[in-house]
Amino acid sequence: MLSKPMELLRPSKGMINVHPIQRGGILTEEARKVLLEWGDGYSMCDICLEGRVDLLDKPPVKRFKEEVAEFLGMDEVRFTAGARHAKFVAMSGFKGALVVDSLAHYTTYIAAELNGLRVYEVPNTGYPEFRIEAESYTDVFEKVKEETGDYPAVALLTHADYKYGNLADAKKVAEICRDYGIPLILNTAYTSGIMEVSGRETGCDFIVASGHKSWAATAPIGILATTFEFAERVFRVSEVRGNWSGRAFTKKEVALFGCSPVYGLPLVTLMASFPVVKERVKRWKEEVEKARWFVEEMEKIEGVMLLGERPKNHTLMNFETPSFNLIAKKHRRKGYFLYHELKERGIFGVQPGMTRNVKLNVYGLSWEEVERVAEAFKEIAEKYGLEVED
């Protein structure tokens, strides 16, 4: 018996999407135009002479790689299967202890575990701002030295975290790392591609980026940028040789699985969107202004309070919403009521079932759209008897 056809249309079509992990990855018109052209499997390998996607001349991936390195203020770039893969590759060049901020994404921990690194966390300031203080890296470095006899092999800082959208002081952390001689990995999954990020200006040794989170590309694709100092270590080529066949793969980079598995839409959409990405980072100040205005409007609703640093320096935000949670306890749809109320008003992306907290992102929305989202929350609040300031 044939299986029932799967419904593959997105429920968010035509709505304002405020999903916290999707705003920076919404495709540009230029990227949408290449979807059908390059949709076939292995489509970028039509004329592959070097056995590595990053060395292709047609399409010009090799040149693009150089342009991305310049854009990020670094020397060498590789494309990876997401930011999680980029972190794994960066960590593969080190042994010993890794110091990470306590707001790091779970994939940071998994990448460390896969590389056999022992993880030490930098505490945050806790409720309600959860900030990472740069000086705390010094304390943890000394703790590692005291416990192990050696300073950490490498450190990682999440530039903007996925929980609260706090923007960490990368330059200050990099200065501390440089004083200790500890290389720094800067995870910019939620920053580079939507705001200006430069490795030379911050002083970091590695930049990890996410094409599908912040560079308007299809998933999965990440970027790892580094300096000449570390390129050979983390992009080391294969030395294996078959004992019977004598086969060797001397151009294949080990941590990249030989050839980065992004040969198709992820890479070509990244390339197509790049001219727009280079320009849009210059408008970051206005994006932050929208976010700050939105916070003011949301906090006019009874019981709603922003979590994370103030003022906002990023467009991803997390609100504590106990008043909506009280409504959910009495509503027949329980925690799903808010999701459905927003959907009826053309707003999509808030996690279904969640009313204790509301996490969203307004990056790339027009002022009119940001206002519509704020008004939708206010309307829902008033509908259920919550007070809303004028």
From Swiss-Prot:
It is an enzyme of class 2 (transferase). GO terms for molecular function: Sep-tRNA:Cys-tRNA synthase activity. The keyword Transferase applies. The modification N6-(pyridoxal phosphate)lysine is found at K213. Keywords: Protein biosynthesis, Pyridoxal phosphate, Transferase. Gene3D superfamilies: Aspartate Aminotransferase, domain 1, Type I PLP-dependent aspartate aminotransferase-like (Major domain). InterPro entries: PyrdxlP-dep_Trfase (IPR015424), PyrdxlP-dep_Trfase_major (IPR015421), PyrdxlP-dep_Trfase_small (IPR015422), Sep_Cys-tRNA_synth_arc (IPR013375), SepSecS/SepCysS (IPR008829). Pyridoxal 5'-phosphate binds at A83, R84, N187, S210, G211, H212. Its EC number is 2.5.1.73. Pfam families: SepSecS. Belongs to the SepCysS family. Converts O-phospho-L-seryl-tRNA(Cys) (Sep-tRNA(Cys)) to L-cysteinyl-tRNA(Cys) (Cys-tRNA(Cys)). This is O-phospho-L-seryl-tRNA:Cys-tRNA synthase 2. It comes from Archaeoglobus fulgidus (strain ATCC 49558 / DSM 4304 / JCM 9628 / NBRC 100126 / VC-16).
